[in-house]
Design a protein with these regions (language model features):
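Active-site rim/adjacent substrate-binding subdomains
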Residues: 1-148, 153-190
Length: 190
């Protein structure tokens, strides 16, 4: 079922998600709703907080995104990330590298706002599977960025938390538009 995406300033976006039982039928329903909602919004990732539920569940699907390549490794061996899409993250634990890369990011909870965000170049991921097991992989490129972005949501962190105070002042007006549910007006380039 397609659910409403919660926009910036909703308290649930700052809520740390509770761990869940991955085998629960309620979690499967939540995952189905996350995928339906993400695809309807044409996103590459969506966290449970973004549809109003503060639990540690997120979904990602970078299939077909060629302009921003993804990388994935399992047990140190490179694999094709498309073979593992769509992806479900349940109670994920991350270990990001110290090396950072800055690239542009958007967020379905911040419609129309794209920012340059520094993120780890690569991240090791351990997540639960629907049968209660574990799945471990490393991710880089767009997939790594999407994992880091969505798992931030699961802990009540937003991509605007990664920008400087000066940049935050520059987007203050845009954030007010989003809070009111209004589109950010087009601005002329300097």
């Amino acid at each position: 079922m397609i659910r409403e995406i919660v926009h910036y300033d909703a308290p649930v976006l700052r809520a740390k998600g509770k761990e869940v039982d991955p085998t629960s039928p309620a979690i499967q329903k939540l995952i189905d709703d996350l995928f339906d909602t993400m695809r309807h919004a044409r996103g590459v990732g969506l966290a449970s907080q973004q549809i109003g539920e503060a639990v540690q569940v997120a979904v990602i699907d970078i299939s077909g995104v060629k302009e921003r390549p993804s990388k994935m490794w399992i047990k140190g061996e490179p694999v094709d990330p498309e073979d593992y899409m769509p992806m479900i993250l349940i109670n994920p634990v991350l270990k990001p590298t110290k090396t950072k890369i800055t690239s542009h990011e958007g967020c379905l909870s911040f419609p129309g706002l794209t920012l340059d965000i520094p993120r780890a170049q690569r991240v090791a991921v351990k997540t639960r599977t629907l049968d209660g097991g574990h799945f471990e992989f490393d991710a880089g490129g767009l997939l790594g960025r999407a994992v880091l972005h969505e798992v931030d949501h699961l802990h009540g962190r937003l991509y605007i938390d990664h920008i400087s105070a000066e940049e935050r002042r520059e987007i203050k007006e845009d954030l007010e538009y989003i809070k009111r549910g209004e589109p950010i007006p087009e601005r002329e380039e300097d």
